[in-house]
Amino acid sequence: MRDRPYTLLSCSVSIDGYIAGVASRLLLSNDADFDRVDAVRASCDAILIGATTVRTDNPRLLVRSDARREERAARGLPESPMKVTVTRRAELDARADFFRVGDAEKLVYCASPWVAAARDRLGPVATVVDAGDNVEMRTLTTDLAARGVDRLMVEGGGTVHTQFLTEDIVDELQLTVAPIFIGDSEAPRFVRDGTFPWNPARRAELVEVQKLGDVVLLRYALSSRFQEAERGDGC
């Protein structure tokens, strides 16, 4: 068994690198890309988002296609993947769609000082896991692997993207670029400041460019595990 899941980071951005507006959500994808993302979700064992994304976007994180849900059920899997979120201070509402909608298992990784509060608030709707004082993503993914997660999809937001990428635990990046500009430095970006492994001396490998209506999918291999997965050698 691998010490962490094969990890795929998926994000939609504006041309100038933002993932949302300041005051409201923006539609950065189209129907073709939504369907592509749905297929990727259906192929994964778990989907991870940060607590801020749970609060601001209130996502359900479900597989939408009836056919894909049926195919998962036929394989003995839940209709949608496990939902995972990360929080430092347990500031989550148990009534959020993340917890309320769907039958998939829900995990909340929480910083040690706030675990008791998280279990009081979220215990009826999720499993709260003590993630240590610093909530490092490598430790989190090791725990997910021990729980049987072989393929993990990370869907935001910027802080979570930054943590996964700077810790060098992303195997594949799927970046959809929408034909709009945000033009506001206060808006959330794809990543925050950090020391990233990919630089002029270590360039990410672009493996696919796909036009999907008016958006473009850029697919990058960020580790050797990408080639292994593509060959079907396992994740």
Which residue ranges define each predicted feature?
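Enzymes that bind and transform nitrogen-containing heteroaromatic metabolites
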Residues: M1-C235
